[in-house]
């Protein structure tokens, strides 16, 4: 029996908590302990074991400490297996590249950002080159359809499988009929967080050019922390374009139910990041019948079209009539069949964890 250790290698509380909750509340009820129980998590503030009684969680104060713990285990027992959830930890990449961790010991679920090279400068170019080499030294890679297509071009010999992030969704809401009011200004959601990859200011200018100032704009920027300067820049531009009445910037992270209620009020989402991210928010918008604009560089468009969902591309002509038509198309889709919705993504996780421990699927 192979024990699988799940690695959350960077201190990203929101995403890490989602994964831990999914394993504790869902997978632990049906899968064997050796597949789901053992976690190593980077968390400066720590994690309460009482919140996840079905799991055994070892916390490390930072990424480097976590990487050292994983490397020590990998070297002490070459039969030990690791499942990397996301992978924003340079020390682990270097350990794979140097052979301290063997390819056959590692499966990796891509979260998106680690595939893309957005920073500039000599230091980053060198690191990206090393990371590309390390990413070819993985036993098995799991990702969205679009990310797999990107990865397979660069590492064609590595086995891959489709797998979706376990978005927190209430399946009962998928059946809910949503009627969008046709009167009054449209409400547009810009971005899924305060991260600069959302390119908030560029999105606000594009919305103003397409729709004028007679739309309501909501910008959630509750995380990441220590982001006050960028938030102030976005707020200044948003108020100048749309005015106090039509521009709302959310500086605090909303409780989940409040976030859902906010999404229900939207007519359109606007997400122009040039990579796969924000799938959780995209799933919830689809559930509520809200179409969205995405960049052509975001490979998740391949997953959307595979599920026969309407796609609005950033840079194309857009007006209210096209938005309403996308809403109509979205309403006609059988959302219960969407592969990246709960509970449809569960089978992918069952298969992935069995594969990672060398068991038949």
Swiss-Prot record:
GO molecular function annotation: 4-acetamido-4,6-dideoxy-D-galactose transferase activity; fucosyltransferase activity
Job description of the protein: Catalyzes the synthesis of Und-PP-GlcNAc-ManNAcA-Fuc4NAc (Lipid III), the third lipid-linked intermediate involved in ECA synthesis.
Bilayer topology term: Peripheral membrane protein
Keywords: Cell inner membrane, Cell membrane, Glycosyltransferase, Membrane, Transferase
One GO CC term on file: plasma membrane
Location(s), subcellular: Cell inner membrane
Stored InterPro entries: WecF
Protein name per its UniProtKB record: TDP-N-acetylfucosamine:lipid II N-acetylfucosaminyltransferase
Known catalytic reactions: beta-D-ManNAcA-(1->4)-alpha-D-GlcNAc-di-trans,octa-cis-undecaprenyl diphosphate + dTDP-4-acetamido-4,6-dideoxy-alpha-D-galactose = alpha-D-FucNAc4-(1->4)-beta-D-ManNAcA-(1->4)-D-GlcNAc-undecaprenyl diphosphate + dTDP + H(+)
EC numbers on record: 2.4.1.325
Main location: membrane
Stored Pfam families: Glyco_transf_56
Record's keyword annotation contains Membrane: yes
Family: Belongs to the glycosyltransferase 56 family.
Alphabetical GO biological process terms: enterobacterial common antigen biosynthetic process; fucosylation
Pathway: Bacterial outer membrane biogenesis; enterobacterial common antigen biosynthesis
